[in-house]
Amino acid sequence: MDTKDAAIVAELNNYAPFFGTASYYSSKLQGRPTASGERYDREKFTAACNILPLGTVIRVTNVRNGKSVRVRVNDRLSKKIGRIADLSGRAASTLGYVKAGLTRVKVEVMK
């Protein structure tokens, strides 16, 4: 691990779990490019988040039902929407909030 990678790991270790509202991507975005350059795939476990660096793996827990999923941050959110994460369709389905559209979540950086 080089110095830059070590600094990133040290920075990520400083993130305490945080809470907020999560939404999920519209199916209309399937195949469109994300901030990381990869194409959005609703079947992958990915997320958009403005708080954490691209490539960060996080555990997202639906606080209403206790279900959790691990996702990789590969995109950014519009700053106007007031959410902490926008999850892929598959991740939202696993967490059980597709019908509701939004849910309160706990986000933890995986070390």
Task: Place the predicted regions along the sequence by residue.
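Secreted/periplasmic proteins
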Residues: 1-111
